[in-house]
Structures are given as structure tokens and as C-alpha cells.
Amino acid sequence: MGIKKINEWEKAVVFLLNLDGWELEHCGDGYSRYDAKGKTSKGVDCVIEMKFRNKYYEDKMLEKDKYDALMALDDVVKIFFVNDPKGNFMYYLNTLQMPAPVKKHCPDTTMWTKKRLLKD
């Protein structure tokens, strides 16, 4: 899945949430730490980081540096959205008890490449 397709999926999620009373704008085209920002259906400021996986993993993964950057934002609801073959999952990061970080060899960029880095 290329970055253009990922951006289309991100925009589709924003569109669907906006149909449900959210007020979001897509901002995943650049180098932002999140893919959408705006207000929840209850009018609370929020940001959403989105991941689209081709394979199902029981344990959902968010890179530690992205998590830390999201958690550093003040007075905003932080949401992690994951789409995979088994469904769509939204996690409210503000109060979620996170496990200890685990180092994994992952692609060096958003797009799947053969180059791997050890990431938290």
C-alpha cells in the first residue's frame, strides 16, 4: 500500500467520523505526528494517529517516539486508530495503561522497505 493510498484511507476515516458529529481535518500529508486533528463528537479537541495494516496482529503497535510526541500535547484527546483485516480499533491514549516498550526490527520508513531499524 503506497503513501497516496494511505492518505486516501486516512481521509475516508476523517469523512466517516465527521458524519458522526466529529469536526476533523486531515493533516497526514506532511510530517505531522498525527493524521487528523479537530474536535470529537462531544466538542473536545483531539488528534488521531492512524495505522493501516495489511496483516492482523493481536498486539497493536505504536512507535514509542510517536506515542511520546502525542502524549506531550497539552489539553487534547489523543486517539490511536488501527485498521487491519479484522476490523477498526480506536484507542483513547490519555488514560490507556501502556505496556513496557519492546524493541522490534521494523521498516525504516512508513512504506515497507527491506531496510530494518531497531525501534521502541
Model-found features: residue ranges?
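Short amphipathic alpha-helical segments and helix-helix/interface helices
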Residues: 14, 66-71
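Active-site-adjacent loop/helix micro-motif of nuclease/hydrolase catalytic cores
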Residues: 54-67
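Nucleic-acid nuclease catalytic cores
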Residues: 71-97
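Acidic-basic catalytic patches of nuclease active cores, encompassing PD-(D/E)XK
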Residues: 1-28, 39
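Conserved catalytic cores of phosphodiester-cleaving nucleases, focusing on short active-site segments
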Residues: 36-38, 42-54
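A structural signal for short, well-ordered beta-strand segments and their strand-loop junctions
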Residues: 26, 47, 78-82
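Beta-rich catalytic cores
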Residues: 32
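Intrinsically disordered, low-complexity terminal regions enriched in charged/polar residues
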Residues: 90-120
